[in-house]
Amino acid sequence: MNDIDREEPCAAAAVPESMAAHVMGYKWARDKVGQSGCAVYRLHSKSGGSDLFLKHGKDAFADDVTDEMVRLRWLAGHISVPSVVSFVRTPNQAWLLTTAIHGKTAYQVLKSDFGARLVVVDALAAFMRRLHAIPVSECSVQQWTTHAGLPERGSIEAGVVDVDDFDKEREGWTAEQVWEAMHRLLPLAPDPVVTHGDFSLDNLLIVEGKVVGCIDVGRAGIADRYQDLAVLWNCLEEFEPSLQERLVAQYGIADPDRRKLQFHLLLDELF
């Protein structure tokens, strides 16, 4: 997928007055990948400068945008993430303007140069190790669940789980069936680290075979390391199953916990 596939040109969106000066003179495009209820725009510089990204959320999604701003500012002291240029919050809306990280997503690289697949997977594993090595004691953000119990049922009870987007293995399932399948896998021994929360191929940027940063960190926080491993494991299945085994080996796990992988694959269906 190239940039044209990911975006469609659009008119400039309305922004708060305090943010207007930051977005003047850019060519706007609406991002079509991974918006998760928010409007995401890429602002292309016309003068050869750096591009920007604008994320806008309303109501509950305004909280998601706010969460991402908080995590970006904290993670900036530990790993490469977009810099916050401007942030505005009102009771019902939030706007987050950030710098764009140079590079192609890991998904784009694998699609365009499958011969680079081993280099890419090794780079992703190395970046995940760096992220997970951040001291948990320095992070105040807890993720959805520990393995003493299941996560909050909020998304199920609110009826916002997209059952049509479930993985092939769970086509036709209800959200309750996913919940029950998760319950059958408990208890699991917790292994908390600082996680990305959505460590997918579209959220990792690569230049010359190395990960240069990550984006969409609104779900980052303390959780089991298998949360990130499971998300990336699932993404790699599209390309070659052997890449999944290489991922966990390069990460440093000789014998992956299949129950934990399955638990987190199920958990991801609910978000």
Curated annotation (Swiss-Prot):
InterPro entries: AGP_Transferase (IPR051678), Aminoglycoside_PTrfase (IPR002575), Kan/Strep_kinase (IPR024165), Kinase-like_dom_sf (IPR011009). One of its GO terms (biological process) is response to antibiotic. CDD domains: APH. One of its GO terms (molecular function) is ATP binding. It catalyses: kanamycin A + ATP = kanamycin 3'-phosphate + ADP + H(+). It is an enzyme of class 2 (transferase). Keywords: Antibiotic resistance, ATP-binding, Kinase, Nucleotide-binding, Plasmid, Transferase. The keyword Oxidoreductase does not apply. The active site is at residue 198. Its EC number is 2.7.1.95. Pfam families: APH (PF01636). Resistance to kanamycin and structurally-related aminoglycosides, including amikacin. Belongs to the aminoglycoside phosphotransferase family. This is Aminoglycoside 3'-phosphotransferase. The lineage of its organism: Bacteria, Pseudomonadati, Pseudomonadota, Gammaproteobacteria, Enterobacterales.
